[in-house]
């Protein structure tokens, strides 16, 4: 590919104490078949050596930019810093313990070039050693606000979104499910998001990670419906039941 004829894509990766996995995550970006990207790694005051590992990676590839925050701000605010600094036409988010397949950006850009401002993809589940542990989560080819109430099919590491949309709607760190709140806000502005049914992301389930704390997540989900999305009690109850049922199917069946 000739990078001069291809739009720049900004990859935003927050990092906090990512010693075990951040280099693998970065390599999955550097190995993309689509080469015209910048990778912004926002380090949120890591206490391990992961900032140094990222800086070493940046020395060998000038597409990597490292932003070291002076104060710990949390993952949502770290993402916001990267989004604000983005120079690309599109933004793709990647958590520092997840991995992309090498054609992720290329395939999602192809969808975006057809007019999609919000793109997502299917993904599978791996353990800490990259072993597959569950059947893949295959996403629908389209979703919207009402469908996302019942089943959240977009995750941070699968997202590929027009930069102007992301910069106009930053993550809200007041809510536990800040990513879900953002997708719903975007779907109120841009009614349809488009999914690639091919698995393009490996979602690593790490022991003790926030995403694995299901009981707390369930409590906060109700708070998200009522306070963030301002849904009435009946709609919130319907959405919560569907959320719980789909969560069981996604993570346990």
Model-inferred region functions:
Residues 20-23, 48-56, 99, 103:
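Acidic helix N-cap motif at the loop->helix transition within catalytic regions
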Residues 91:
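Short aromatic/hydrophobic "clamp" motif used to bind/position activated sugar donors
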Residues 1-30:
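N-proximal low-complexity "stem/linker" segments adjacent to membrane-targeting elements
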Residues 6-9, 30-41, 49, 61-65:
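Short loop->beta transition adjacent to catalytic acidic/histidine clusters or analogous donor-positioning motifs
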Residues 84, 139-216, 224:
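Conserved nucleotide-sugar donor-binding catalytic segment
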Residues 28, 43-52, 71, 95:
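A conserved acidic beta->alpha catalytic loop
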Residues 69-86:
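Glycine-rich, basic loop-to-helix element that forms the pyrophosphate-binding segment
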Residues 103-133:
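Conserved donor NDP-sugar-binding/catalytic core segment of glycosyltransferases
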